[in-house]
Amino acid sequence: MKRIHIFGAAGSGTTTLGKALANELPFSHLDTDDYFWLTKFTHMREIEDRKKILKEDLLKYERSILSGALCGWGDSFKPCFDLVIFLWIPKDIRLERLQQREFQRYGNEILAGGSKQEQYEQFMEWASLYDHAGIEVRSKTLHESWMEDLTCPVLRIEGDYTVQERVKIILEYLRLNEKRSN
């Protein structure tokens, strides 16, 4: 096992899990936000630049865990992964996490009259679409479609688990599959 990809909806915990898993395994943690954004959450990097930088890092780090979504712009990386982990949590829990995260990032600027209010409201509206939208946006439907032609195993972790519980599930999965392949 050399490359693991963890993805799911915004607020599902992909980055947090990627970091925690990298602390347990001899893997480097990479996050798609670092490739997608030129300036975090305001200016997108050109697609070809994202791909080039990600490819360089995947070559640089022999064992890596990539968290975050690649759908659309990073489809060419699908064959690179030995395991894909899909995270899903109930919408109400996910949106509450996102509200807390955004408040920690921007404070009162997301409240009425704040400089980030409009951006925050648009982001939350977009995030709320995940469970019922079609493939035209980052949605569960798009993610399910993206997983259909993966050649590697997919481990689905669906439900409200703690980070530690998720890490335990993954380590157990890896241990069992290590035994099967020997």
Regions from the PLM with identified roles:
Residues 125-182:
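NTP-dependent small-molecule kinase module
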Residues 88-138:
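A glycine- and Lys/Arg-enriched "phosphate-lid" helix/loop adjacent to the NTP-binding pocket
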Residues 19, 23-62:
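Conserved substrate/cofactor phosphate-moiety recognition/catalytic segment
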Residues 47-92:
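Glycine-rich phosphate-binding loop used to anchor ATP phosphates in small-molecule kinases
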Residues 3:
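Walker A (P-loop) ATP-phosphate-binding motif of ABC ATPase nucleotide-binding domains
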Residues 6:
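Hydrophobic anchor at the beta1->P-loop junction of P-loop NTPases
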Residues 10:
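The conserved Walker
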Residues 14-15:
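Walker A/P-loop
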